[in-house]
Structure formats: C-alpha cells, structure tokens
Amino acid sequence: MASSMMASTAAVARAGPAQSNMVAPFNGLRSSVAFPATRKANKNLSTLPSNGGKVSCMQVWPPEGLKKFETLSYLPPLSVEDLAKEVDYLLRNDWVPCIEFSKEGFVYRENHASPGYYDGRYWTMWKLPMFGCTDASQVIAEVEEAKKAYPEYFVRIIGFDNKRQVQCISFIAYKPT
C-alpha cells in the first residue's frame, strides 16, 4: 500500500509544473494611461463628426395612419411601369406569378387569440397561378381585372418557386383609397 501511495504522489508532483506551463500569460493589454480620461471640453457643434448632411433628407415613418405592408411598402405606390419591372424580375427568376386579394390588408385576429387560418395571413387567390406566363403585361392585365372586380380590396402579386415549393416574393400591387 505504501508503494502505491508513493507512486501516486510522485505522479502528482510531476503533473504540477506541467500544468502551469500549459496556460500562457495574457499579453497585449494596453496600459490605461494610453487612453484619455476626460472628454473634449469644446462644446462647439461645428467640430462634431457628420455624415455629410444626409440626415436632413431622412424622414421618420408616421406611427399612425400609415401601416406597413410587405416588400416595398416603404416606397410610394408603384406605377404600372414599376409593377411591370417587378413582374419581369419575378419571371426572370422562373417564379410563377400569382395574384391574391383581401378586404383587410393586414394580419388580424378575430376568431381566436392564437394564430389560425382566418387571421388575415391567407388571402383569396385570384383565378389560378399563372403557370407558363412569360410576359409582365399578362400579369398586369389580371391585376387590373382584380381591381375592377374588387375596388375596395387590396391586391398583391406573389412569386412562387415551384421547384423549391416556396413563396419568394410578395408585394402589394393595389391599395384601396
């Protein structure tokens, strides 16, 4: 028994110095003397850094009366030419255009506190998805038909990738007045 205790203390004695060499000292800290301790005493605002005057052209989104929708909702209403460019982008990516409409353009909970089918996330589809559509004017014509049929409804265009089975883009094409 004594021989086994001697062997274990010898092993511990040898392991001690090896562990202290395993952790390197922490180098690279600078002395606090190198950092200034006081703030600049000059209160002249002309010496403050600026971003080149871009702040004057920024606007704050009004918190009431203008709700945000989906993609591109921060822009002014899209013209027919702008819609055509977005639909061309959608078609160039081989996405299937789909038109949907809804009376309420926002998510709302009316029937239950938890999310469900009737909480405004799902809109009514206008006709069928436009499989095989190659021209933006076809999609714009369908949007115009939907606007005439439901003038008090929101109309949106969705780009659906049928290979990945996902919705890739969605934006409001028409907002009722």
From Swiss-Prot:
Coiled coil: none
A single cellular component GO annotation: chloroplast
Induction or repression: Accumulates to low levels when grown under continuous white light.
First-listed, main subcellular location of the protein, grouped into a coarse class: plastid
Pfam families associated with the record: RbcS, RuBisCO_small
UniProt entry tagged with the keyword Transit peptide: yes
Protein localization: Plastid, Chloroplast
UniProt GO molecular function: ribulose-bisphosphate carboxylase activity
SMART domains linked: RuBisCO_small (SM00961)
Residue range of the transit peptide in the UniProt record, numbered on this chain: 1-56
GO annotation, biological process: photorespiration; reductive pentose-phosphate cycle
Record's keyword terms, sorted: Calvin cycle, Carbon dioxide fixation, Chloroplast, Photorespiration, Photosynthesis, Plastid, Transit peptide
Keyword check for Chloroplast: yes
Note: This protein is coded by one member of a small multigene family. The basic functional RuBisCO is composed of a large chain homodimer in a 'head-to-tail' conformation. In form I RuBisCO this homodimer is arranged in a barrel-like tetramer with the small subunits forming a tetrameric 'cap' on each end of the 'barrel'.
Role of this protein: RuBisCO catalyzes two reactions: the carboxylation of D-ribulose 1,5-bisphosphate, the primary event in carbon dioxide fixation, as well as the oxidative fragmentation of the pentose substrate. Both reactions occur simultaneously and in competition at the same active site. Although the small subunit is not catalytic it is essential for maximal activity.
Description of how the protein assembles with itself and partners: Heterohexadecamer of 8 large and 8 small subunits.
Entry similarity comment: Belongs to the RuBisCO small chain family.
Protein name listed in UniProt: Ribulose bisphosphate carboxylase small subunit, chloroplastic 2
